Amino acid sequence: YTSKMHVISNGYESRFTPKRQRKADEPSPVPFRIVASGRLTNEKNHVALIRAIARCRHAQDIELVIAGTGPLKKRLQRMAGRLLSRPASIGFHRNADMPALLRSGDLLVHPSIADLESVSVIEGMAAGLVPVIASSSLSAAGQFALLDESLFPVDDVDALARRIDWWIDHPAQLAKWGGTYAEHTKTNYSVESSVRKFVAMEREAIADNRR
């Protein structure tokens, strides 16, 4: 391509509003709810997430919710039942219920090996969740990370466990960055923001064509 390229997000729906963040002096809750969302398939790598939680220092305090459907559902449920200290919820959630589900969480983990835009990560950030995202050459999701503690090498179970423990150990940072991610997402990835960028792109293209 010889023309200028513009990358514009699909955007997220305005019903994904941010949750109320905890006060800076509040400890991490027990149970500490980790939310993941996506197809229950190999490339989404929820197996790594379950294994990582099992290796966390705070494993006994963590509750896992994975919203999605797919061929690995029963395998993931069996694995979670065997490895995790608390019962996990793994399965279908209505789209209408997703904003409330995300707001009920404390941390968003996206362990996927392969992705396109990862709208589920955008929706989680819009809801005020700090993301912990797999850094993968086959996924675009890593671009959403605003600090190192939001990234881990793809499929590195021990690194993911350390990231999860770090956020549980630092509740003030979790609250601060939850608000930061929500504001950043609203500014850069809302449908309104995407429309503005698209209109600006069209105007630029028209102006260039007239030269």
Please provide the spans of the model-predicted regions.
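Carbohydrate-associated surface elements
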Residues: 11
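A charged, aromatic-enriched C-terminal amphipathic alpha-helix characteristic of glycosyltransferases
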Residues: 172-204
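Nucleotide-activated donor-binding/catalytic signature segment of Leloir-type glycosyltransferases, i.e.
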Residues: 75-93
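Conserved donor-binding/catalytic core segment of Leloir-type glycosyltransferases
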Residues: 26-44, 50-53, 65
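Short hydrophobic beta-strand element within catalytic cores of glycosyltransferases
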Residues: 130-134
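Conserved acidic donor-binding segment of nucleotide-sugar-dependent glycosyltransferases
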Residues: 146-157, 166-171
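Short alpha-helical donor nucleotide-sugar binding micro-motif in glycosyltransferases
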Residues: 92-93, 100-105
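Aromatic "clamp/platform" in nucleotide-sugar-dependent glycosyltransferases that forms part
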Residues: 113
